[in-house]
């Protein structure tokens, strides 16, 4: 298995995995994923084996310290030399859940963001996943300003 960045040819596969992982109101559409890949392919980390993508993480870089709903929809808010790596999705293909795939990709994202000189990483998650992200050093900052998909999210931050 290897971790690589996204290519335009990956969009359909990524959209399928996203759709299988989130309710439609929460997950990114194929069009949204295509827009993100076009603007910041290096902010997609894909775990693949052969031609099969098992998991991926994506999000952009910004100087804004908090994750907002607008960030999900506008890839042009990406600031390549920004201070914070945002994470929008941490997803695993259904056939590969509970194999440690998402953890492996997330560890790589953390290492890459630190090596790039970012201040840290910000993501939002549902309350039931706070413990999962805490094991990587993320701290729960409480309920997020984001109401993406009409869901209550917790903002988690890993500061380097």
Where are these regions (language model features)?
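Conserved GNAT acetyl-CoA-binding A-motif
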Residues: 106, 111-125
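Conserved acetyl-CoA-binding loop-helix of GNAT-fold acetyltransferases
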Residues: 92, 98-111
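Conserved acyl-donor/pantetheine-binding loop and adjacent beta-alpha core of acyl/acetyltransferases
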Residues: 56-91, 97, 146-153
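C-terminal "cap" of GNAT-fold acetyltransferases
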Residues: 7, 126-127, 136, 146-160
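Active-site rim helix/loop that mediates acceptor-substrate recognition in acyltransferases
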Residues: 23-50, 56-77
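A short beta-loop-alpha structural element at the N-terminal edge
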Residues: 2-14
């Amino acid at each position: 298995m290897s971790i690589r960045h996204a290519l335009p040819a990956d969009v359909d596969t990524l959209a399928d995995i996203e759709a299988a992982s989130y309710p439609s109101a929460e997950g990114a559409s194929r069009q949204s994923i295509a827009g993100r890949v076009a603007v910041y392919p290096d902010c997609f980390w894909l775990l693949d084996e052969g031609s099969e993508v098992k998991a991926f993480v994506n999000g952009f870089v910004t100087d804004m310290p908090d994750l907002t709903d607008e960030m999900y929809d506008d890839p042009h808010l990406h600031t390549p030399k920004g201070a914070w790596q945002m994470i929008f999705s941490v997803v695993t293909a259904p056939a590969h859940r509970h194999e440690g795939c998402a953890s492996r990709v997330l560890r790589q994202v953390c290492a890459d963001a630190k090596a790039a000189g970012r201040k840290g990483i910000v993501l939002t998650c549902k309350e039931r996943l706070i413990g999962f992200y805490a094991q990587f050093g993320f701290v729960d900052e409480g309920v997020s300003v984001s109401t993406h998909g009409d869901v209550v999210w917790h903002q988690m931050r890993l500061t380097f």
